[in-house]
Amino acid sequence: MSITAERKTALIKDYARGGTDTGSPEVQVAILTERIANLTGHFKTHTKDNHSRRGLLKLVSQRRSLLDYLKRKDEGRYRTLIERLGIRR
């Protein structure tokens, strides 16, 4: 269910703003989006897994908060990020 270290490194490389950037909102949102996609696939076969569903809602809320922050600070970066990730908004 969790993302592999290689996939996480690839996401960091793709969305980083600088060479060693791992904490920018873009990177965090990309990693959260990957985790959300994995959990969504999990629920296709495990529909009654309510403990994990609570974790999914927490991840979605965290991603929403980061996106709101990014929209407040720099709307251009926000727009390009949601287009790259294919997030509805």
UniProtKB/Swiss-Prot annotation:
It comes from Methylobacterium sp. (strain 4-46). Transmembrane segments: none annotated. Gene3D superfamilies: 6.10.250.3130, S15/NS1, RNA-binding (1.10.287.10). The keyword Acyltransferase does not apply. GO terms for cellular component: cytosolic small ribosomal subunit. One of its GO terms (biological process) is translation. This is Small ribosomal subunit protein uS15. InterPro entries: Ribosomal_uS15, Ribosomal_uS15_bac-type, uS15_NS1_RNA-bd_sf. Belongs to the universal ribosomal protein uS15 family. It comes from the Bacteria. Pfam families: Ribosomal_S15.
